[in-house]
């Protein structure tokens, strides 16, 4: 519980991209991201290893891979701009790097939404010591 509280405090205090990603997830899924996704499966949250546990965890795996392709900015901290039109997220701005980060986040938020029916509470706070399968490549 303490880790969850610390994560919540850190994310609320961030003015850059992590707070934006949180808002995007909330908009697309209706779920509170810190509670529902920060420690989900083997790939949601910090780091990642092993094989994704389900479709939601795979969203995080793909998101990590997407971040791995971004060059020229810091995907976790650089600020980007986006708007929401008719329920769709539109990434904006002139900076190609931060726009790419926004597109990674948008794809993950949509993936979470599209997999809400298979979301499993048992993976909400899944201990990574159980992520022992060979790690997949992007």
From Swiss-Prot:
EC number: 3.1.1.4
Organism field: Protobothrops flavoviridis
GO BP: arachidonate secretion; lipid catabolic process; negative regulation of T cell proliferation; phospholipid metabolic process
Obligatory cofactor(s): Ca(2+)
GO molecular function, one term: calcium-dependent phospholipase A2 activity
Highest taxon in the source lineage: Eukaryota
Sorted UniProt keywords: Calcium, Disulfide bond, Hydrolase, Lipid degradation, Lipid metabolism, Metal-binding, Secreted, Signal, Toxin
Active-site residue list: 63, 105
Protein name: Basic phospholipase A2 PLA-B'
Main subcellular location of this protein, as a coarse class: secreted
Lineage per the UniProt record: Eukaryota, Metazoa, Chordata, Craniata, Vertebrata
Tissue: Expressed by the venom gland.
Residues reported in the UniProt entry to bind Ca(2+): 43, 45, 47, 64
Family: Belongs to the phospholipase A2 family. Group II subfamily. D49 sub-subfamily.
Function description: PLA2 catalyzes the calcium-dependent hydrolysis of the 2-acyl groups in 3-sn-phosphoglycerides.
């Amino acid at each position: 519980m303490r880790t969850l509280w610390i994560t919540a405090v850190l994310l609320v205090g961030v003015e850059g991209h992590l707070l934006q990603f949180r808002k995007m997830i909330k908009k697309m899924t209706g779920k509170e991201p810190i509670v529902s996704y920060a420690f989900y499966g083997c790939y949601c949250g910090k780091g990642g290893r092993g094989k994704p546990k389900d479709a939601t965890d795979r969203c995080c795996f793909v998101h990590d891979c997407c971040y791995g392709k971004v060059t020229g900015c810091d995907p976790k901290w650089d600020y980007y701009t986006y708007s929401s039109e008719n329920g769709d997220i539109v990434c904006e701005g002139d900076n190609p790097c931060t726009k790419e980060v926004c597109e990674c986040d948008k794809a993950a938020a949509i993936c979470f939404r599209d997999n809400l029916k298979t979301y499993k509470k048992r993976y909400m706070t899944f201990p990574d010591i159980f992520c022992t399968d060979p790690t997949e490549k992007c």
